[in-house]
């Protein structure tokens, strides 16, 4: 098998910088496709966390003037990841996270910051670095949406480009006056270019101009072609349906392995699943919950937002707790939801615990100790927490949308009888149906044999990158051979 070279371009990558599932995907993809003959490097911005976490950085190119300041490209490693780092302090060295400042507002120069990333990716793809000529480019989300535009309007030969939508809700829309500042010609500002409702649409540009589009589950690929999930881009996505496909994410099964996880109190596997009881006990103590081994303990690991359906959870919480259930929540996001769960923890001491923020170790501990994991999203491109939940024996209770629908087998009578059920699904996504799903979950939990089968079925489900990597490698080769 001939080795292909691929350059992935992304705004975050695990373990260096992470705000969500995008980082998990970009961090796991290189090793996954390597098994299928694809040598992948990843271009990422030089945030402080990235510069502080890389090994053996070597300058391979410098720019005297690059989007308002000097910059350089560093070749570096982090564990098994082969990286190119865009070290541009005027763009990336600042407090806050990659997209917002300490005041929780978008950085005012985000248009320039991520145009720079896309431009660097395009130049590398077109031979900027001697001796490195990637066969394929793979761009991720709105932050790299201009990459295929830079390729298209350069007038120079370029490799084919795959563009992946991780979440269509984040679109990167900016004023048209920035066109010259981001280095695009006037002809790019057209309906079949980067123009979007009178401005510049970074995500729209990627969808319009990439050679192939992927998103992170087959169901989501269909949903976004409709008005409810299409976010205004459904017409374009229907137009490009022949170039659009859904490839499920996987999880890094070395990072997420309950039999060897150093972040949890007690490791276990399918044969020793009873050891989860120790993790549940520790989790109850960590969240200030009553030490009741028989209480149905729900976990939530989520961004706190309308998309994630956590407002519905607050609405149904009193009824859920009346049945004796417990809730351990880890997340951050919209201020009203943060306040709502803080208040719930005060109102229901011993039954509700909330940690506002993100803590990787605590996320592992919730997966290992919760009886069930709640994911009541109104839409969910793929979702990773439910995949980790399957692997850890925390029964997922999910809305029947996107990747949640594709990865969790509902415990209906037939699925239970045939031994394939792995969780609970509900639809439509309303508070009433969430309540019904919680009631169903309680009934399943009370049937110890059925519940154990759900756990074992989940833990033996292949949630690794093996199958997704095959699909990506096949897609890359199709484009290169076309």
From Swiss-Prot:
Protein name in UniProt:
Glycogen synthase
Give the source species.
Rhodopseudomonas palustris (strain BisB5)
Q: Which UniProt keywords apply?
A: Glycogen biosynthesis, Glycosyltransferase, Transferase
An example molecular function term from Gene Ontology annotations: alpha-1,4-glucan glucosyltransferase (UDP-glucose donor) activity
User: One Pfam family this chain carries?
Assistant: Glyco_transf_5
Q: Name one GO cellular component term.
A: cytosol
In terms of domain of life, where is this protein from? Bacteria
Q: What job does the chain carry out?
A: Synthesizes alpha-1,4-glucan chains using ADP-glucose.
Q: Which family does it belong to?
A: Belongs to the glycosyltransferase 1 family. Bacterial/plant glycogen synthase subfamily.
**Residues reported in the UniProt entry to bind ADP-alpha-D-glucose:** 18
What's the Enzyme Commission number for this chain? Answer: 2.4.1.21
